């Protein structure tokens, strides 16, 4: 099983950026926790962070075709990353959108996600543990084969 974890703009600043909102755990610490969980169950976990939408799209195009699951925290691209949304939409793997903070308790512009319509589900407001919950959900879909996201969305055969 192969899971991709994609971290969008400014997530490289976790631990220093607004710790009252995003917590004090760094991105490296989050990735290490996720790698440890994945290794414990024999899952290949690939992580990427970029402040540039095109770099995230390049990663999806290179690694996404045979992925069994995608976890994405698009950061600010949540609200306007249409090219990222389109790159996700062309893949078959289930997609879990993760946000460290509860975006619905914050500024109104954060309430809209262009990613959500192509995601299987969304986890928000649970801090770094939201990533672990996403992994656990994806592990629960193991063995269901391609089309899991499509079946969940009811959009494709």
UniProtKB/Swiss-Prot annotation:
Substrate binds at residues 73, 79, 86, 100-101, 110. It catalyses: 3-dehydroquinate = 3-dehydroshikimate + H2O. Gene3D superfamilies: Dehydroquinase, class II. The keyword Lyase applies. It is an enzyme of class 4 (lyase). One of its GO terms (biological process) is amino acid biosynthetic process. InterPro entries: DHquinase_II, DHquinase_II_CS, DHquinase_II_sf. The record marks 17 as: Transition state stabilizer. GO terms for molecular function: 3-dehydroquinate dehydratase activity. Pathway: Metabolic intermediate biosynthesis; chorismate biosynthesis; chorismate from D-erythrose 4-phosphate and phosphoenolpyruvate: step 3/7. The active site is at residues 22, 99. Keywords: Amino-acid biosynthesis, Aromatic amino acid biosynthesis, Lyase. The keyword Hydrolase does not apply. It holds the Pfam family DHquinase_II. Its EC number is 4.2.1.10. Catalyzes a trans-dehydration via an enolate intermediate. Homododecamer. Belongs to the type-II 3-dehydroquinase family. PANTHER family: CATABOLIC 3-DEHYDROQUINASE. This is 3-dehydroquinate dehydratase. It comes from Roseiflexus castenholzii (strain DSM 13941 / HLO8).
């Amino acid at each position: 099983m192969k899971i991709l974890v994609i971290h969008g703009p400014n997530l490289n600043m976790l631990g220093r950026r607004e710790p009252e909102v995003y917590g004090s755990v760094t991105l490296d610490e989050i990735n290490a926790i996720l790698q440890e969980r994945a290794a414990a169950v024999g899952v290949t976990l690939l992580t990427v962070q970029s402040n540039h939408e095109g770099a995230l799209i390049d990663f999806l195009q290179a690694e996404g075709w045979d992925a069994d699951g995608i976890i994405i925290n698009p950061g600010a691209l949540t609200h306007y990353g249409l090219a990222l949304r389109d790159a996700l939409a062309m893949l078959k793997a289930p997609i879990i959108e993760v946000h460290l903070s509860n975006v619905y308790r914050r500024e109104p512009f954060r309430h809209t996600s262009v990613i959500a319509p192509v995601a299987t589900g969304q986890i928000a407001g649970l801090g770094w543990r939201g990533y672990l919950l996403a992994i656990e959900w994806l592990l629960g879909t193991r063995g269901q084969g391609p089309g899991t996201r499509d079946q969940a969305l009811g959009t494709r055969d």
